Amino acid sequence: LPARQTLYEYYHDKFGFGAKTGIELGEASGYIYPPDSAEGNEVRYSAMTYGQSMNLTMVQVAAGFSSLVNGGQYYKPTVLVGTIDESGNLKSSENKVIRQTVSGGTSSQMRTMLTTARRSSFLSKSDKSGYEIGGKTGTSEAVVNGAYTQKETIATYIGYGGGKNGAEYVIMVRVAAPGKGINLQGNLHAGPIFTDISNWMIDYMKIA
C-alpha cells in the first residue's frame, strides 16, 4: 500500500491526473482509483506505471508533462492570452503556478532523457538545427467494449522544444482510428505530426 500511495500522490496530487484542470473549456475529470479502494489493487497500479488502467485527458497529460521539463512548476492550463480593455489595450494574463511537482534536478534529468530519446530517433533528422527538442513516443492498445484489444492501437507523441532559455512549448499528438482495426505507432504516425508543429512553433514564437 505505501508504494501505491506514493504513486497516487504523484499522479493525482502533484500532476493532477484524474482531476479537472480548471481550463476555460468543457473537460472531463478522468479517474485514477485510490490505492485504498477495491479497484486500486496491486495489479491495476502495476499497469498504471506504463500508462494503462487509468483515464486521463490530453490537457492533464500535457500540463503534467510541462512541469517535468520546465523545472518542476505546474502551471494552471489556460486558453486565455489576456483581456482587452475599453481602449483596446491588451492586458496579458498572468501565468499561475499551482505547485511544484518535481525538483529542478529531476526536471533537468528528464530533459536529458527526452532529448536523448529524440536524437536516437529518425524523427530528429527533420528538426530545425540549433534547438533543444525532446520527446517520447507512445503506442497503446485501444479499448473496445470495455476491454483492451490487440487488434487496434492508438499512437501518441508528446514532446517539447526551446532555445537558449530552455523549454518554451509542449506539444501532444494523438492519432486514433476507432473501429478500423489499424495498428498505429507513435513514431510513424504521431511523431511526424509533432515534428511539423514543432518546426512551425519555433518560427511562430521566434525562438532564439
Summary of predicted features, one role per range:
Residues 1-175, 190:
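Beta-lactam-recognizing serine transpeptidase/beta-lactamase-like catalytic domain environment
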Residues 89-97, 188-208:
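Short, gly/Ser/Thr-rich active-site loops of penicillin-recognizing serine hydrolases
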Residues 74-75, 158-160, 182-184, 195-199:
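Glycine-rich loops and low-complexity Gly/Arg-rich segments
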Residues 70-74, 119, 180, 199-207:
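A generic secondary-structure boundary signal that marks alpha-helix termini
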Residues 177-189:
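A short acidic/glycine-rich loop-to-helix N-cap element
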